Amino acid sequence: MQQLVADFFHTQAGKALLNSQKQIKIEAPETNVVGEQRLFIHSAEKAIVNSQGMIELRGEQGTSEFNQAFSYQKTVEEKAKRCVVYFKRSENYNGEYGFDWFHLGKQEDMSKGDYKFVDTIGHHYETDNDGKKVTCTDGNAAYKYPFEVLSTQIDKKRNSFEYFNIGFKLAKARIGVTPLEDFTYYIPRMTMMPDTEINLVAEIELDREENKPKEIKLQFDKADNLKLSHTTLPVRAGKVTLTISCTGELTEKRTLTAVTDDGDTVGTLFILPNSKEHQRDIKVVFVKVKTKLDGQKEKTGIVIPESITLFLNVLHQALVNVDEGVKEVEINCTEKEFAENFRYLKGIEYGIDESKAQLLQEYVMKKMVATFNTTYKCYYTVFFFGDKCFTDEGRLNGYAYQNSTYGVFFDGYNSATVPHEMLHAMGLPHSFDYQGVPFAYKYHTTDNIMDYSHHLPNPIERMSLFYWQWGILNNKIV
């Protein structure tokens, strides 16, 4: 809509709201914004005051600067007045598609790796000489330090989602029946590779029996290359398994909505574009290394099939495609020179000496060139040893260098070790490391592949990535 006023425009109301999901522009040779009692300017990300001339700041009673932001709750559209449909990962989810949502920590899902963002987003901190809390700078050891929730980061996380208010829950929240945090519907976002089929769960919650709708329909805003197993949902509380098939490339974001018979939107899911323009292609080779550290018994590294599956699944969450799949080759390091340079005797057992890590990388990379020439020059090269890796304090199952194309794994690694370490190589820090990233999370609370949740007495299976991590791995993600 375009409206032109030639002379004077005046609008007046007891309360007024200008709201846009995209952009609002106010332009004039002179603009005055007045808050007679209070003027508040807020940004969840970055606020810029820009002048090509001069900036003046005036305060009759002084000016102050603080490094702590106020919280701000923006005005949100109200929908879902009679029921709500939440889209969730399937019960047997194994990381095969990306799914990012605002965690509210439903109690029945806690043991499966769910949790509350309001208890989990913040930083592990040290105390400086002045007694102030400062974020840990050692990303590998941060988990050993105390954790503190950061409310500004939680607000930032909320604002990273599109959301609306759940009408019937908001009404109950206003009279204290429903917790305040439960009436906001944060729209989840997901990724899936072309020519794949995935399972989701639609969880239906109803208001009073007399207020329930007659019908709940499921529909895409644009159905090209997408198929859905259900076009309607039962009008009863409970869970329904849905199957979404992606039969080709998606060149733009798609929206799945649940709509009642009166046109009320009661659930929404965003599916991000997955066309070649939005994918990142890499090449990967897994190298099994044959050794003879004691001079007698040969050992060859083993590639656990589940490690390949999980590695590919996690990459696919970020729309990272391994061109032609993971290659597997073998190199021979049974020569005496290798054993003498890299073995470490612990008790009666020989293993690889971790302190020789840099020399080990140089040695095996030269061996790759000697064996295969330059065939694997532009590959992520991942080595597997049949030997343990010993340190003075204990042992390592594997490691990779940040922002590199190299990783190495030893006897004792598990299926999650490979994607965890190789995503370090691709630029991801630990999930509890709050340095140079938008968010950090309390140690061992998530099923994120970059967490240390396997340290728990009852380990949480690590298999997922957050939306912001997708963007680090693949800058073509939208």
Annotate each language-model stretch with its function.
Residues 1-79:
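Right-handed beta-helix
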Residues 81-279:
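Beta-strand-enriched, solvent-exposed domains that form extended recognition/catalytic surfaces
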Residues 196-206, 256-258, 284-286, 375-387:
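Short, hydrophobic/proline-enriched secondary-structure or compact coil segments at domain edges
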Residues 221-233, 392-405, 436-438:
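Small-residue (G/S/T/A) turn/hinge positions that recur once per unit in extracellular repeat modules
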Residues 256, 404-478:
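The catalytic-center signature of Zn2+-dependent metalloproteases
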Residues 265-350, 378:
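Fold-level signature of zinc-dependent metallopeptidase catalytic domains
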Residues 289-297, 326-343, 388-394, 433-449, ...:
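Extended charged low-complexity segments that act as oligomerization/scaffolding linkers
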Residues 317-412:
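Active-site-proximal segments of metallohydrolase catalytic domains
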